[in-house]
Amino acid sequence: MRLAFVTSNPGKVEEARKYFEPLGVEVYQLKVSYPEIQADTLEEVAEYGAKWLAQRVDGPFFLDDSGLFVEALKGFPGVYSAYVYKTIGYQGILKLLQGEKNRKAHFKSVIAYWDGELHIFTGRVDGKIATEPRGSGGFGFDPIFIPEGFDRTFAEMTTEEKNRISHRGRALREFANWLKENLK
Ligand code: ITT
Ligand code: NA
């Protein structure tokens, strides 16, 4: 089976590929841009994007909308994560948290799969924001996020390690389980 992943982010593709490879599913990147609406939740953003793409893309596809939610910043950047990453970057988040004791944060990932109907899969990982960036793996906010139970950032892990515990890994697991049940 081949699965089209609509995304502009090669880091996401790499993670989905590594996740699905052992299951005999090939993931390929489909670079079609779609509107990301301003909404309160990742689910709404993902659902709107998937329904918009459904009118324009042939065959099944999935997309992933993710965000980093920092407790001391009342959930910011959350649904604005892509914009914040492009503008102030992870250095900007570190600056906002300077001197802050509460470093708790979580990542959330929403996968929307369209096969004529919409299917939503989600995953979350709790952790904290590091005081300085570490590691060169991964992408995005990975150098400043330390998952609970670890003392390394996501950027200091291999893709396989990150997949085992990450928001996206968990959403991919739900997605893969659903495919197993529904493609018989
Ligand atoms: P799409 O084309 O798939 O939308 P994107 O990078 O814009 O790619 P999102 O809107 O979902 O993706 O991402 C929001 C931001 O959060 C973006 O800057 C990502 O780099 C970052 N991000 C998403 N998942 C991440 C992860 O697993 N680790 C670190 N940063 C992540
Ligand atoms: Na995006």
UniProtKB/Swiss-Prot annotation:
Q: What GO molecular function annotations does the UniProt record carry, in alphabetical order?
A: dITP diphosphatase activity; ITP diphosphatase activity; metal ion binding; nucleoside triphosphate diphosphatase activity; nucleotide binding; ribonucleoside triphosphate phosphatase activity; XTP diphosphatase activity
Example of a GO cellular component annotation carried by this entry: cytoplasm
Required cofactor names: Mg(2+)
- Tell me yes or no: is Magnesium among this UniProt entry's keywords: yes
Family in the record: Belongs to the HAM1 NTPase family.
Assembly, in brief, is: Homodimer.
**Record's protein name:** dITP/XTP pyrophosphatase
